Amino acid sequence: MRPLDQCQSIDEAWVAVLQAAHHEAHGRLLHVVVAIDAPGPPMPELVALNDELLQQSGHHCVDRVASTVFPSSSYADPGLTFDPDMPAESLAILDSAEQDLYSRYRTMLPQLQTFDGNSHGTYFGRLVSWPGKDGDGYNQLEVRVRQLRGRRRRKWSSTNAADMTTDDPVWSGGLREYDAQDERPFGFPCLVHIDISVVNNRLSLLAVYRNWYLIEKAYGNLIGLTRLHHFLAQQTGYELGELMVHATVADAQQHAITKVAVAALLDRANEQLAARPGRETAANGVAVTRELSSSSHGRIPAGTSR
């Protein structure tokens, strides 16, 4: 296993994993673990760098990859965070935004599956309509939100905020992305599981990838996971915790992209990281969810299944 240093941002995390893999003889790492303290919006400069290389190699852009994990274009952020004592009118607005996201995506899922690479479904489709074959499946994400809200309500009514974790310090639950009975030798979803844990009132995510393609997918994956993370924090009222990714194999794609091109990308990315100004992060989901979300709500979220 290769645990990397704790990162402050998804930008640092992406560059750190790519750099570590690039320095390996074959450009691949086994069992990489990277953690981000404060997952927030990506650096536009790094998105542009990644997009430039993706366009040259004929791959989907970063935002399209991110939309497969969380389609921000389909979520009309209400600018509210769940609280057990929030007014009924505000709760109704928050609930409406959540339900609109689910219904909009589930309605579009059959059409999305006709797009290139989506024949076996999309990541977000499996979250809101398991197993993701159509729009009538089991909504894992909605169930987890309701469970977490119920947890917040019970703790709020029985203890004060300072004592919330005294009786039961850890609550965890997962979101499935992979069917264990799926015997396809190829075409597996690379993202197989998302674990949700609450410790000390902080909601953290762990995403498990079988194969993590560091040029083609990883940065977009991190952006999408961050959007999902902030959505969960906003809809449940928990503080934003750590985002962690465990990749069975992390691949710098030096054979497909070329080692020279990856090295050039890393040089430019490290320059951008070194030159960036201080970047603020939000204590909960609201501020960053707005920045992470697209302004064009309602359009079909393009994406591929991996």
Where are the predicted features?
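Terminal, non-catalytic protein-protein interaction segments that mediate quaternary/complex assembly
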Residues: M1-R306
